[in-house]
Amino acid sequence: MSGEEVTFSSEGCGIAGTFTETADPVAAALLITGSGRVDRDSDARLPGGLKLRTGITRAIAEALAVAGVPSLRYDKRGAGRSGGDYWTTGMDQRLADARAGLDWLAARAGGVPLLAIGHSEGTFHAAQLAADGAVAGAALLSGSAQTGGKILGWQTRQLATRLPASARLILRLMRTDAVQAQRKNQDRIMASSADVMRIQGQRVNARWFRDFIRYDPAPVLARITVPVLAITGGQDVQVPPQDVDAIGALVKGPFEGHIVGDLSHLMRPDPDSAGPRGYRRSVRQPVSPEVLALITGWVASHWGHRATARGAGAVDEAGR
């Protein structure tokens, strides 16, 4: 397999990515990353300049390549080598970038079926491409069937239970309710028209948050008639694992859904239910081989049996 540095244009903005090529492809996949300032590999730039190297889309690209599926993954606007401004990019622009990436992939892939594989926020865009009939199938990793506003509330409740005991005590002493504080911040964002705001001292992309809070994926999911794969970790605290079943109830095409054991939102084991507090430690482990095998197996079942034979090797190769 080989990785080629490529660029394509979206609404006049240069988007940089990696095309992973294979011989005799059975399909080709567009990989769409999750929320935050992340690059093509799903590595995130955190406040203060620190980087969280999750490598989720890189691992998927490597597994797919061994299974005979070339892929394109790309940096978000204002991240990695892409142009544009991350802080003023909303969900509509992210969808436009996904569509432009799919057009580039279609021209390069040479007539094979096109797939969209999204993680977290990327599942919304993968689902939209599937609903529009632009792809032959969609894989949704850590996806949701609820509005963004409901997801933010659910996240806050989950994360509050995972705070260290000392932090929970401080919140009680200060008479601070985490859920109420989250709602207050959300109301501030929704009442503003600014692209960028400061919330609790942190710079946030308010434009994206307004888009996300309003967004309801259910009507889009209900229009999908192509095959869909949904995978969420049983310890995910950023989207409800049970939404896998909700996605399955909404889509009209062939559906395969999995809630995988003790995996977190980063597709890695979280046996202690640490949530984001444990992310920096968990990324020392590889992306779950089970998840990679489920993806390549799903591709094989719909678009080519060669992916099954190659997929076992993909798990070991991409999981290192």
Give residue ranges: language-model regions.
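N-terminal cap/lid segment of alpha/beta-hydrolase-fold proteins
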Residues: 1-24, 28
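Short, surface-exposed "cap/lid" segments of acyl-processing enzymes
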Residues: 24-63
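Conserved alpha/beta-hydrolase
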Residues: 51-81
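Alpha/beta-hydrolase active-site loop
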Residues: 56, 87-108
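Accessory cap/linker subdomain of secreted extracellular hydrolases
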Residues: 141-218
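Short beta-strand/loop motif that positions the catalytic acidic residue
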Residues: 224, 230-232
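Conserved alpha/beta-hydrolase "acid-adjacent" motif
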Residues: 237-243
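Catalytic active-site module of serine/aspartate enzymes centered on a nucleophile-bearing elbow/loop
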Residues: 263-267, 271-320
